Amino acid sequence: MSAPLHRGLRHVALRVTNLARSRTFYEQLLGMRVVWEPDPDNVYFSSGSDNFALHQIPASELTAFQPLQGQLLDHVGVILESPEAVDRMYQEVEPRLSELGGRIVKPPKQHRDGSYSFYFSDPDGNAIQALYEPTISKLEWVKGKT
């Protein structure tokens, strides 16, 4: 195969236990913008060329809901333009995380491939990596274009 059959991974959807709490977390902490709210149990965000969805776990499933012991989703990530931008984001989000239901999972760290990142979690424990990666971070993103 010479070319991929797709235009890139641009959509991630997470099931959440409290949609209002999770929506506040992603709007206030990450500045995500709501682009579609088809009903009270689903909300879709975008930061330009991506699509991130939160889906409320139905009330009928919520009482019996048990997160997987060994979570299958390792993490989702946001790309930053420099190691300094990673540090700035860490300084901005760290003091606000607990009030919004999240926590720092791993503090900023230099990786052997030249990347630099930290991890934090949302109110449901989903890990988010704030990442500078030398190759990916150099790519130019055009807002609203894919």
Task: Please tell me what each predicted stretch does.
Residues 20-33:
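Amphipathic alpha-helical segments
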Residues 59-65, 106, 137-140:
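A short, acidic/glycine-rich surface segment
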Residues 111-112, 131-137:
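Short beta->alpha transition motifs characteristic of CBS
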Residues 2-6, 66-71:
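Short, flexible turn/loop "capping" segments at secondary-structure junctions
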Residues 10, 31, 40-41, 74, ...:
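Residue-level marker for the onset of beta-strands and adjacent loop->beta junctions
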Residues 1-20, 76, 134-146:
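N-terminal beta-strand motif that seeds the catalytic metal site of vicinal oxygen chelate
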Residues 16-20, 76-123:
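Vicinal oxygen chelate
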Residues 33-70, 127-132:
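Conserved short beta-strand elements that form part of the metal-binding/catalytic scaffold
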